[in-house]
A protein has these predicted regions:
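Conserved acetyl-CoA-binding loop-helix of GNAT-fold acetyltransferases
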Residues: 91, 97-111, 134-138
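Conserved beta-strand-loop-alpha-helix junction that forms the acyl-donor binding cleft
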Residues: 123-133, 150-154
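Acetyl-CoA-dependent GNAT
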Residues: 8-14, 19-96, 111, 115-116, ...
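Conserved active-site tyrosine of GNAT-family acetyltransferases
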Residues: 136, 141, 163
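Glycine-rich acetyl-CoA-binding "A-motif" of GNAT/NAT acetyltransferases
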Residues: 68-72, 131, 157
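Short acidic/polar active-site loop segments enriched in Thr and Asp
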Residues: 82, 119, 142
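Conserved GNAT acetyl-CoA-binding A-motif
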Residues: 114-124
Length: 185
């Protein structure tokens, strides 16, 4: 897998992101009730604008591979002096299973812990989304709780897993990784 880089989410990313959200269920799985299906440019323009400015509590990113191809979307939200939440994580459906998700999450954690100096990063993920849960556990998140029947989708209820990682856990993983690879970043 190529190294993943993040850049600010922009208008040129709208069509690609819209093409990845092909059903009401996919919309809920990606964004909860934040957007209505079908996703459109007007909704994304308001969303993009909410991540701009010095006082914004969210950072919205497009993930790119080593060739610069757009391969995902990720947001760091609810940023305060101590914590934040990862949300609206999506990998191009044609590129899933190649480590892109974990690469995106690692980049956001670098921002959270190295640049913003946060103590904790959390997230919520639907309990049936085992590939995503595996991705988050791979980078060091731990499960903290189970929210039963937390979201209604059509005539069914979906449950959520709450997960988090603390700065000390992240740093310990980085030291272990650096020692194993000989990388002194």
């Amino acid at each position: 897998m190529d190294e993943i880089s993040l850049r600010p989410f922009d208008r040129m990313d709208f069509d690609r992101l819209i093409s990845w959200i092909d059903s009401p269920e996919a919309s809920v799985q990606w964004a909860g009730g934040f957007f209505r299906f079908p996703l459109d440019a007007a909704q994304l323009e308001g969303y993009r604008g909410s991540g701009e400015g010095e006082l914004s509590t969210r950072r919205i990113f497009t993930a790119c591979d080593g060739r610069g191809d757009r391969v995902g979307h990720i947001e760091l939200s609810d940023i305060d002096r101590h914590s934040a939440r990862i949300c609206r994580v999506l990998v191009d459906p044609a590129r899933r299973g190649n480590g892109i998700g974990s690469g995106m999450v690692r980049q956001v954690l670098r921002l959270a812990f190295d640049e913003l100096r946060l103590h904790r990063v959390e997230l919520l993920v639907f309990d049936f989304n085992m590939p995503a849960i595996g991705c988050y556990e791979k980078v060091g998140f731990v499960r903290e709780g189970h929210l039963r029947d937390a979201r209604r989708v059509g005539d069914k209820y979906w449950s959520l897993e709450q997960m988090s990682i603390l700065e000390a856990e992240w740093r310990a993983r980085q030291e272990t990784t650096s020692a194993a690879t000989g990388d002194d970043r």
